[in-house]
Amino acid sequence: MSDQEAKPSSEDLGDKKEGGDYIKLKVIGQDSSEIHFKVKMTTHLKKLKESYCQRQGVPMNSLRFLFEGQRISDHQTPKELGMEEEDVIEVYQEQTGGHSTI
């Protein structure tokens, strides 16, 4: 078990100078590892995605981020998506290719 799985880490995202509502989000990878992010409700989720990918050492376009089964786009904010404290974002490996079997 890696350190990351043993104790979830957290990262603070957003502008600390301004007031604002923050929530803690859990980002769970396919390997069940958790990283916690504290984000401002109006922060574009691109920041969270970039930070997660940097920690994992993978390019951002190689992963897909989902909230309640829907893909998260870079310009969306937690407020737009109706996210609440401790909500979960799932991360999956991007899959391309394949063909129809019809």
From Swiss-Prot:
GO cellular component, one term: plasma membrane
Pfam families reported in the protein's UniProt record: Rad60-SLD
SMART domains membership: UBQ
UniProt-annotated location(s): Nucleus membrane; Nucleus speckle; Cytoplasm; Nucleus, PML body
Family: Belongs to the ubiquitin family. SUMO subfamily.
Function: Ubiquitin-like protein that can be covalently attached to proteins as a monomer or a lysine-linked polymer. Covalent attachment via an isopeptide bond to its substrates requires prior activation by the E1 complex sae1-sae2 and linkage to the E2 enzyme ube2i. This post-translational modification on lysine residues of proteins plays a crucial role in a number of cellular processes such as nuclear transport, DNA replication and repair, mitosis and signal transduction.
The protein, known as: Small ubiquitin-related modifier 1-B
Lineage: Eukaryota, Metazoa, Chordata, Craniata, Vertebrata
